[in-house]
Each structure stands twice: as structure tokens, then as C-alpha cells.
Regions:
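Class I SAM-dependent methyltransferase Rossmann-like catalytic core
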Residues: 1-30
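A short glycine-rich, Lys/Arg-flanked "PGG" loop and its adjoining helix->strand segment in the class I
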Residues: 119-135
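A short acidic, Gly/Pro-enriched loop at the edge of an enzyme's catalytic core
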Residues: 90-101
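A short SAM/SAH-binding and catalytic strip from SAM-dependent methyltransferases
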Residues: 100-120
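Short alpha-helix
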Residues: 175-192
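Conserved class I S-adenosyl-L-methionine
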Residues: 32-43
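Conserved beta-strand signature within the Rossmann-like core of class I S-adenosyl-L-methionine
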Residues: 136-144
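Conserved SAM-binding loop of SAM-dependent methyltransferases across substrates and taxa
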Residues: 44-55
Length: 222
């Protein structure tokens, strides 16, 4: 467990993984320099530098106002909004749309204020991602295929397991396959009126975390 913790804390390794995502998009003839991009869970921005310098515009949403100076320093040309990303997206009626939507979501239950376990992974916001799309967009988010549970977080782990089971259904959510997840999210997006043009998964931390990439098009677009 100590070795795993050390690996998880190595953000340089994670930031390198995003370059593989960008390389994949280039193989699909995606012109990154023409994309308007957004990161919905900004954090310190550690994993987004490569994205920001590759795209046309970059917007960051982050709940922690204390991180704003660091984000402004790392991303001088980005538009930075301090907000609850999930609630903002739920109420989103802005005309601003994006071509590349990054969701570097937490990997367990999380929240703010009186309810630190209010949300889980990307489950509470993925259904609203279409609000950010004009005609089509690339959506990239994290999926925990094989979660690890720290013993000292027993109550939090129980809530996390419950939320995963509710979201994914009657399967073993402790060991999910890429084919299952690809099918699951393709169907989820289809039910939201979004057609999958292409998809791929790229490891961020084996065997647990993967970046899942979906190129989506709204069904009412000809």
C-alpha cells in the first residue's frame, strides 16, 4: 500500500499520460489548435498544461478559490472560474460551447461544506455534459476500473461502493472491463441524444484509472 500511495502521489507521471491522449487525437486528425477546451475539475492544473498550450482557448472551473493564483500563473491566457462545477453545469444556460471537454474527476465520493460525500466520481455531472456541446465535441473523463480502498476510510469506501453499484448496475464494480465500460457509456450518451463517432481508453494508472475518450455528436445535427 505504501508503494501504491507513492505512485499515486507522483503527479508528473500522470501529467505525462495526457500527452498520450493528445497523440491519439492527432491520429484521428483532430486539429487541437482549433479547439475551445474546458477542464471541469481544475485542481492545481498539473495535468492540463500540455492541453492548454495545444488548443485555441482554455477555460478552467475549480471550486477552491485558494488555487486561483496558482492557476492564473500556470495558465495566463485561460479563463478561470471559481465555482462548484457540478452545480454550475446543472444550471448551465450559457451560450459558450466547447469542442474539448476535460473531466479530471475525483476517484471517490467527495463534496464541500456539510456534505463531504455528496458527489461521486463523474456520476453527478456526466448527464449534463451535453449542455456544453454545440454540434460535436470530444469528452475525456476518468474511470476507475478497479478501485483500491484504504482501510482507514471504511465509511467513505462503503458510500463509494454503493454509488458505483447504483450507477453501473448489477455487475462487479470492483473489476470492470474496457469493453463493458465502452458499451455502457456509448449507451449512456445515446440516451442523452449523443452519438459516439469514435472512442478509446488510455491508461493513466494501471490497473485502476483510465482516460476514456469519446468523440460525440448531437443527434439533431445533420
Amino acid at each position: 500500500m505504501e508503494d501504491l500511495t507513492k505512485t499515486i502521489s507522483n503527479m508528473d507521471m500522470f501529467s505525462l499520460r495526457i500527452n498520450r491522449v493528445l497523440d491519439f487525437l492527432k491520429t484521428k486528425s483532430v486539429m487541437l489548435e482549433k479547439l475551445n477546451a474546458i477542464e471541469i475539475f481544475g485542481g492545481t492544473g498539473q495535468n492540463n498544461v500540455a492541453v492548454a498550450i495545444s488548443v485555441k482557448t482554455f477555460e478552467i472551473w475549480e471550486i477552491d478559490g485558494k488555487l486561483k493564483p496558482e492557476l492564473e500563473k500556470k495558465f495566463p491566457n485561460a479563463k478561470i472560474k471559481i465555482c462548484n462545477s457540478i452545480e454550475r453545469l446543472k444550471q448551465y444556460q450559457n451560450t459558450s460551447k466547447f469542442d474539448l471537454i476535460m473531466i479530471d474527476n475525483p476517484i471517490s465520493v467527495f463534496g464541500a461544506g456539510k456534505n463531504p460525500s455528496e458527489y461521486c466520481e463523474h456520476f453527478d455531472m456526466i448527464k449534463n455534459v451535453g449542455k456544453l456541446i454545440d454540434k460535436e465535441a470530444i469528452v475525456i473523463f476518468l474511470i476507475n476500473k478497479k478501485p483500491f480502498f484504504f482501510n482507514k476510510l471504511k465509511k467513505k469506501n462503503e458510500l463509494w461502493r454503493k454509488r458505483r453499484q447504483e450507477f453501473y448496475g448489477n455487475i462487479n464494480t470492483n473489476d470492470m472491463s474496457i469493453p463493458f465500460l465502452t458499451s455502457f457509456y456509448t449507451e449512456l450518451f445515446r440516451n442523452m441524444g449523443l452519438t459516439t463517432i469514435f472512442t478509446n481508453s488510455i491508461p493513466r494508472h494501471n490497473p485502476h484509472l483510465d482516460y476514456f475518450i469519446f468523440m460525440l455528436r448531437k443527434n439533431d445535427v445533420q
